């Protein structure tokens, strides 16, 4: 029986690279995507499907967690809150694009699904880069989430949460993705737009900076 990994894939660059690294390690990939009524939900779902096809994933899940929008309090699900432009948020305080406890919610659900599918690992593309203030993207949080999941699941089940990118910056991530032949043109990072990336939000700026530092042109379309 082959070993299985549940890969949480948003459609973005980091989670996609994680899935490719899982495949390289010999895992049979089960892909998991969450719809939470984020601004770019349709684009992210489309990217997820294309990435699954590129990875030749045989089993995938798209789960509706739209209750996250009902909780609100962030610019990704509440269009009345402006997404900051042309400034990289480097702070100990979570930015307005932080979705409260999103990764905690995702990992709780992933733990349940991993037990059902008998996966030995969960891959998630969290990155601590630049002290962005996302409290659920730290290595410490992930370790505690792993303990929580293993404490609350069957005694004969144990899962490891793998975060191969947690200590890398975007330049290193782009460099590694290119080395592993990850189709970055299938990924999406923009917080705001679905047709052409805005090139101005925090996520776009980090992505563009990563490509610039490795001297490689990003193949996705930008508005400017």
From Swiss-Prot:
InterPro entries: QueC, Rossmann-like_a/b/a_fold. Its EC number is 6.3.4.20. Pathway: Purine metabolism; 7-cyano-7-deazaguanine biosynthesis. SUPFAM superfamilies: Adenine nucleotide alpha hydrolases-like (SSF52402). It comes from the Bacteria. Binds 1 zinc ion per subunit. ATP binds at residues 9-19. Keywords: ATP-binding, Ligase, Metal-binding, Nucleotide-binding, Queuosine biosynthesis, Zinc. It is an enzyme of class 6 (ligase). Its cofactor is Zn(2+). Pfam families: QueC (PF06508). One of its GO terms (molecular function) is ligase activity, forming carbon-nitrogen bonds. Zn(2+) binds at residues 190, 198, 201, 204. CDD domains: QueC-like. It catalyses: 7-carboxy-7-deazaguanine + NH4(+) + ATP = 7-cyano-7-deazaguanine + ADP + phosphate + H2O + H(+). Disulfide bonds: none annotated. GO terms for biological process: queuosine biosynthetic process. The keyword Metal-binding applies. Catalyzes the ATP-dependent conversion of 7-carboxy-7-deazaguanine (CDG) to 7-cyano-7-deazaguanine (preQ(0)). Belongs to the QueC family. This is 7-cyano-7-deazaguanine synthase. It comes from Campylobacter jejuni subsp. jejuni serotype O:6 (strain 81116 / NCTC 11828).
